[in-house]
Amino acid sequence: MRIVALGTLRDFWKRHPDAEQPLKAWYDEARTAAWARPQDIKRHYASVSFVGRNRVVFNIKGNDHRLIVAVAYRFQSIYIKFLGTHAAYDRINAATVEDA
């Protein structure tokens, strides 16, 4: 998969060093994945949530942080829509946020 907005991940882990290794691991796994449908993601990430419009919520570092992406399965692309602490996630609408 092609991941759009890698800089968002880097900026976040500079502010939250505890998230660096989990985000790098997610990036490496997602980059080499070939997800064709939501079930492909769910097989690898059991705790993932789907919130409509091809949006996927990943728990990062044991649920301390949340990553919301939009997946364009047909184009094998992932667009980062939100990355924040769990507290920040609680204040947004995961289905519509565009704050990457």
List each model region and its residues.
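Basic, Lys/Arg-enriched alpha-helical interface segments
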Residues: M1-D64, Y73-Y79, H86-A100
